[in-house]
Design a protein with these regions (language model features):
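PP2C/PPM-type serine/threonine phosphatase catalytic domain
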Residues: 1-229
């Protein structure tokens, strides 16, 4: 297993509210967590950093418990500190052990699997526009430029309880898992993500994708973690 990660402020934002952490555990286990904060400059950064810190401490536990613990910490902080009221963050937390991928997420940060068959989005966006697409009110193409595209329906820290999606699958040799914030997916097409990660130079994947997002406008913070199996 190989892992590489990077975050970038982008070309427009004045601060970076994204956060990530990644690492390896004994026995060939690798893990990563990516968060995209919201709630103003102070609150968004605190929310995403708190989620990452809690995940870092508890990654050996089940991922669902990790995310629930992070949610409680962010929510309590939001309620007790006036300047942080309303803060929250997306989260994607992943762990790979013995070819098994375990994934938990909330919000519109994404995970992709890149294999010999192509690229597959593993997460479903918890967003207003995704709900509209699924109800036939928008096409995927219309959703990209919709004025409500950045409104998410799930986030850590918004309420005392958090509903997450859980995914598990067996990986094949050569597979790559990409975890990213919408600073990448709003500016780089899925096919371009695939084309940028098809060779064996895994250590370049995060740089390549962030560079693509910045070349296409870089209108948001960009965070990418690549886990190559």
């Amino acid at each position: 297993m190989k892992i590489v990660a990077k975050t970038d402020q982008g070309k427009v934002r004045k601060d970076n509210q994204d956060s990530f952490a990644a690492g390896e555990l004994p026995g060939g286990v690798v893990w990563a967590v990516v968060c995209d904060g919201m709630g103003g400059a102070a609150g968004g950064s605190v929310a995403s950093q708190t989620a990452v810190k809690m995940s870092d401490r508890s990654i050996k536990n089940l991922l669902t418990s990790v995310v629930e613990n992070a949610n409680s910490s962010i929510y309590e902080m939001s309620c007790s500190v006036e300047s942080l009221n309303g803060m929250g963050t997306t989260v994607v937390a992943a762990m790979i052990r013995d070819r098994e991928l375990y994934l938990v997420h909330a919000g519109d940060s994404r995970a992709y699997r890149i294999s010999q068959e192509g690229i597959t989005q593993l997460t479903r966006d918890h967003s207003v526009v995704q709900d509209m697409v699924e109800h036939g009110e928008l096409t995927q193409e219309q959703a990209k430029d919709h004025p409500r595209k950045n409104i998410i329906t799930r986030a850590l820290g918004v309420s005392a309880d958090i509903e997450t999606d859980y995914y598990q699958d067996t990986l094949d040799e050569g597979d790559v898992i990409i975890i990213c914030t919408d600073g990448l997916t709003n500016y780089v097409e899925t096919d371009d993500i695939y084309n940028a990660t098809r060779d064996n130079h895994y250590y370049e994947f995060a740089d390549r994708l962030i560079n693509l997002a910045n070349e296409n406008g870089g209108g948001d913070n960009i965070t990418v973690v690549a886990m190559a199996f």
